Amino acid sequence: MALARVVSFEGVSKERMEELAREMREGDRPEDVPATEVVMLHDPEAEKSVVILFFETEDDYRRGDEVLSAMPADDTPGRRTSVTKYDVPIRMTP
């Protein structure tokens, strides 16, 4: 079963989110993070963000979690407020 790493952030400005989105589109993703998909959600009025990373195996999740947990604060969207691991029993696209 796939796993998801769901991270919440505060203090995420619209400008910071635009900068991160541009970096991700240009291929500037964290190395050694074997995520199969990344979803970034942003509430610009509340300056909050949620980042969801999907992993296919427990080993991939562990590797990604180690790298992302060690990431400098300047490389994250804002102040990290929570990190939660979820099983992904259903994942659908149209």
Can you describe what each PLM-predicted range is?
Residues 1-50, 56-70, 76-94:
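Short S/T/G/P-rich N-terminal loop/turn motif that feeds into the first structured element of a domain
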